[in-house]
Amino acid sequence: MGGPYIGIVADDLTGSGDTAVQFVRAGWATQLSVGGAEQALADPAVRQAEVLAVTTHSRPLAAADAAAVVRGEVERLRAAGVQRLYKKVDSTLRGAFKAEIDAARLAWGEDAIAVVCPAFPVTGRTVRQGVLYVGDRPVTETSAATDPVTPVTESHIPTLLGCAQLAAQAGETPAELARRIAAAAPVVVVDALDDADVQRLARAIGVLGQRAVPVGSGGLAAPLARVWAGGQAAGPVLVVVTSQHSAARQQAAALQQAGARTWAPTLAQLADDRNWAAWTAEVEAAEHGMPAVDALMLLAPEGRLAGLDADSVARRLGELAARLVLAHGAAGVVATGGDGASAVLAALQASGIALVDEVTGGVPLGTLTGGQAAGLPVVTKAGGFGEQDVLIRAAQAIRERRFTK
């Protein structure tokens, strides 16, 4: 690697840690430095990291001093080739809040947009009409107001920053939110009342690309780490469903309804070599010219046909899946049904799976070892396991995690 892709600049060590760990959970190789970027980047081990979190220790500093420190750190990270910046701030607005945000934005680039949302709903921090709440109270009515070093005197973040504020809008897409943010630049506070709002904002930041400087706590960092990981994924997640279990069929239907492009051969096509060759040629030719999708599904038909057993169905679909992966690329593979999972691995000549996590109980996530697609993310699932949305979640787990091959 040539150096970190993502830089995190935090005003204290604990905040740096609780933000950096969100990137670890999303699969990024992450290094936390107790000091600044210059010292960290001199370490060969740090140069191998994908995410570097640096600590400015600037929370108790005067505004001008804090701004100077932050500006220097961002400039050094930028010079080192960092492509994405996350400015970690205190979730109760302590410190030289405005000075550090302005310094980070200006150092990042002329067209940079600071997107500010310190919400962390799981810890009770939310932003409503621009006001930061801790539980049901504005932050100035909490102990943060009497902090002995950096007391908080303003709950309304747009007043504190002198900037625009955007309320959440029901049904708004991330792209629509991104357009509103861009129109309100260069500094924008965005409301977030719950995790869904924070996740939508993270996706909007992904749409904005490199010019966005997200400003927040661990609450925004968690979904953003997944969004940025998804930006590294190439191709669709290929889902292979061979199980006849009713749960698997319902899960496949849910995935198709969510937008997965689906190829489903008939029993007659699977049973006859000539029919099968013609159908697979049609699929492979069509996939060359079709628009990109997040998920592509190969779905075995329901029912039985004399002379056609489950192993043959699994083998044919597994071999087709392997050809699609090798010809077109894929972000990963999800296989439901033990025979189907075995067939996919056999067709790719994989020797095993290096496990890294699980999508949900009994649904492991890993990467293939050996064979023609070593390092390819893979989820395997028994046909009867999981809730109705488990295939959707499995595809998301692959797309929203960083895998280092």
Swiss-Prot record:
Transmembrane parts of this sequence: none
Keywords in UniProt for this one? ATP-binding, Carbohydrate metabolism, Kinase, Nucleotide-binding, Transferase
In terms of Pfam families, this protein maps to: NBD_C (PF17042), SBD_N (PF07005)
Taxonomic superkingdom: Bacteria
Residues binding substrate are: D12, R59, K88, V89, D90, S91
Q: Which InterPro entries match?
A: 4-carb_acid_sugar_kinase_N (IPR010737), 4-carb_acid_sugar_kinase_N_sf (IPR037051), NBD_C (IPR031475), NBD_C_sf (IPR042213)
Function comment = Catalyzes the ATP-dependent phosphorylation of D-threonate to D-threonate 4-phosphate. Can also phosphorylate 4-hydroxy-L-threonine, with lower efficiency.
| Protein name in the entry | D-threonate kinase
Gene (name only): dtnK
The UniProt entry's sequence similarity note says: Belongs to the four-carbon acid sugar kinase family.
Binding of ATP, residues: S243, G337, G338, D339, G340, G383
Enumerate the catalysed reactions. Answer: D-threonate + ATP = 4-O-phospho-D-threonate + ADP + H(+)
Q: Which GO terms describe its molecular function?
A: ATP binding; kinase activity
List its EC numbers: 2.7.1.219
Signal sequence extent: none
